[in-house]
């Protein structure tokens, strides 16, 4: 019976991950609230790894949806050479820019991962960052602007590096990786659609690396998977994959006609809720 409920909780976690990883509303903020209600029977070490590795399902959704835009090779059926691969240089250049944008967060993330988890993974920090970034979205969208970059192929290395610098801030729980990079893209002159799509692509190496790091640390620390834990992880990843496809389609349709202001107000409201739950547990129920 415990396994059944753990799998059910994994489904809920997968839904939360699939929605909040791509919408700029902070997956961590929602996970903290979910953890107050969804109590797994697994170890704390497994759950720390589970919260991150479940992102693999979300990453796969981006790869599947945008494979043609991301695959840097084309196939030419030549008579003499047979099946020959040729580089699609516009796509390869996009990957170079993605790598440039990922470097700042990759370097600092590797160096500070444990320290950040120990000092910043708490309800107060998450609530403050939810509210701060919510205000930032509202203020940015109120500023009159004309996007100078509307296509991924027009993104410069300077813009990629600046977006990467903003992504560093996403190491702080509650900021939202997609929220940070979208804000960075908007401030660099990208359109909402361009900033959102670039954010999706940045997630592939960043989230794959973060998931791999957590998995290695779990195994290196003596962690051993039980059958129930493997099942929960697979279920969570599959659900995150399916829901991510729906969330990405929704966001790309949404930004064609709307601003990010609604997400800003939602973040502020969620931050207040997280702060309220923390205050209740700390001062009333303690």
How would you label these PLM feature ranges?
Residues 1-286:
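Multi-pass membrane proteins that catalyze or facilitate reactions on polyprenyl-/lipid-phosphate substrates
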């Amino acid at each position: 019976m415990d396994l059944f409920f753990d799998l059910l909780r994994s489904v809920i976690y997968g839904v939360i991950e699939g929605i909040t990883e791509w919408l700029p509303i902070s997956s961590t903020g929602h996970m903290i609230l979910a953890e107050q209600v969804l109590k797994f029977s697994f170890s704390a070490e497994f759950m720390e790894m589970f919260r991150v590795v479940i992102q693999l399902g979300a990453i796969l959704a981006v790869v599947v949806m945008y494979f043609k835009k991301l695959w840097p090779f084309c196939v030419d059926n030549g008579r003499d050479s047979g099946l020959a691969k040729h580089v699609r240089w516009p796509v390869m250049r996009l990957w170079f820019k993605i790598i440039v944008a990922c470097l700042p967060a990759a370097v600092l993330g590797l160096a500070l991962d444990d320290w950040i988890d120990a000092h910043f993974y708490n309800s107060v920090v998450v609530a403050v960052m939810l509210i701060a970034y919510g205000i930032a979205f509202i203020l940015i969208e109120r500023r009159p602007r004309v996007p100078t970059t509307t296509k991924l192929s027009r993104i410069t290395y300077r813009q990629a590096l600046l977006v990467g610098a903003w992504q560093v801030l996403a190491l702080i729980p509650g900021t939202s990786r997609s929220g940070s990079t979208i804000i960075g893209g908007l401030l660099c002159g990208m359109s909402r659609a361009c900033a959102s799509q670039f954010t999706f692509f940045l997630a592939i190496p960043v989230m794959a690396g973060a998931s791999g790091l957590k998995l290695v640390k779990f195994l290196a620390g003596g962690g051993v998977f039980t059958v129930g834990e493997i099942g929960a992880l697979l279920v969570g990843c599959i659900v995150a994959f399916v829901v991510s496809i729906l969330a990405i389609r929704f966001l790309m349709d949404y930004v064609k006609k709307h601003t990010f202001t609604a997400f800003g107000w939602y973040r502020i409201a969620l931050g207040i809720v997280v702060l309220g739950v923390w205050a209740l547990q700390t001062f009333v129920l303690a």
